[in-house]
Curated annotation (Swiss-Prot):
Disulfide bonds: none annotated. Coiled coil: none annotated. Belongs to the WhiA family. This is Probable cell division protein WhiA. It comes from Pseudarthrobacter chlorophenolicus (strain ATCC 700700 / DSM 12829 / CIP 107037 / JCM 12360 / KCTC 9906 / NCIMB 13794 / A6) (Arthrobacter chlorophenolicus). PANTHER family: CELL DIVISION PROTEIN WHIA-RELATED. Involved in cell division and chromosome segregation. It comes from the Bacteria. One of its GO terms (biological process) is regulation of sporulation. Residues 275-308 bind DNA. Keywords: Cell cycle, Cell division, DNA-binding. One of its GO terms (molecular function) is DNA binding.
């Protein structure tokens, strides 16, 4: 699955309980994916997204948080449209929902940015704004020299609101206009990783980080002359770096780490140059490569989230240039 789709699928499964956070996410999704239309004298809201799971999440939130019914319309692929699109449409209660979510102000005028209640909300609300905006119109490219996380915005006001939400999370994002389209872009790898964590895309983050580490190690290895086994060296470097991150994760979490994650982490630390296959065989009972990798991913994600909450360095703090250069 492409990185963008994997992030959106994971975010669509995220279980959020707090009402204000769900409202912030819905407001952002409708702002960045939606539009207001007048049909037969009624205000109708339509939000077009690229995944069925995103459409289902939005429809459920509209019903559970605001009590309004909506329908999902599938626009099949064809012509210039390479993939199916999904339109969430609210007809009967369109005007009420538009006012509740801040698409319209108290006088019934369209709001171009985000409602003040969302803009001035908590850090969790800011995370929800980014989650909703990314689900609506976000993309994540492969890590590398041109890697980026970006959101296409309906206008400069919403772009500035999204930059402001990022700033409340101590994340630097830039608003740009490219060929008449407003976008908010993040290019720094560490900043992308921090935002994925704040949005709740922990599994996708681990995939992205693994690919990022692999590319960094590969770039370093390619500069080494007359080395007969570059692939083995890259794997060993990546394993050592992963071991250092796990070591830091165990330090951050202390006694709060679940036993099964702690066991996988201790295996990684004890055998820093072993492959995932080898780690699985060393486990008792024996584990598959995917099982050991999944536990390590969850351990690192949990530690990085804790580090963000505490304002301390995350698991990358233990990865030194020497681990990649040797």
């Amino acid at each position: 699955m492409a990185l963008t789709a994997s992030v959106k699928e994971e975010l669509s499964r995220l279980d959020i309980k707090k009402s204000s956070v769900r409202k912030a996410e819905v407001s952002a999704m409708l702002r960045f994916a939606g539009g207001l239309h007048i049909i037969s004298g009624r205000i109708v809201i339509e939000a077009e997204v690229d995944l069925a799971s995103t459409a289902r999440r939005l429809r459920a939130a509209i019903a559970e948080v605001y009590g309004h019914q909506s329908e999902i319309i599938v626009v099949s692929a064809g012509g210039l449209r390479r993939a199916s699109r999904y339109v969430v449409r609210v007809v009967r209660d369109g005007e009420a929902l538009a006012r509740q979510t801040g698409l319209l102000d108290g006088r019934g005028r369209p709001v171009r940015g985000l409602p003040s209640a969302v803009v001035n909300g908590s850090a969790a609300d800011a995370e929800a704004v980014w989650r909703g905006a990314f689900l609506a119109h976000g993309s994540l490219t492969e890590p590398g020299r041109s890697s980026s996380l970006e959101v296409t915005c309906p206008g400069p006001e919403s772009a500035l609101a999204l930059v402001g939400a990022a700033r409340r999370l101590d994340i630097q994002a830039k608003a740009r206009e490219v060929r008449g389209v407003d976008r908010v872009v993040i290019r720094d790898g560490d900043t992308i990783a921090a935002l994925l964590t704040r949005m709740g895309a922990h599994d996708a983050l681990m995939v992205w980080e693994e690919r990022r580490m692999r590319k960094e190690v590969r770039a370093t290895a390619n500069r080494l002359a007359n080395f007969d086994d570059a692939n083995l060296r890259r794997s060993a470097q990546a394993a050592v770096a992963a071991g250092a991150r796990v070591d830091r994760a165990l330090e951050i979490l202390g006694d709060d780490v679940p036993d099964h994650l702690k066991y996988a982490g201790e295996l990684r630390v004890a055998h820093k140059q072993a492959s995932l296959d080898e780690l699985g065989r060393l486990a008792d009972p024996v584990m598959t490569k995917d099982a050991i990798a999944g536990r390590i991913r969850r351990l690192l994600a949990m530690a990085d989230k804790r580090a963000l909450d505490l304002g301390i360095p995350g698991t990358d703090a233990n990865v030194t240039p020497e681990m990649l250069d040797e």
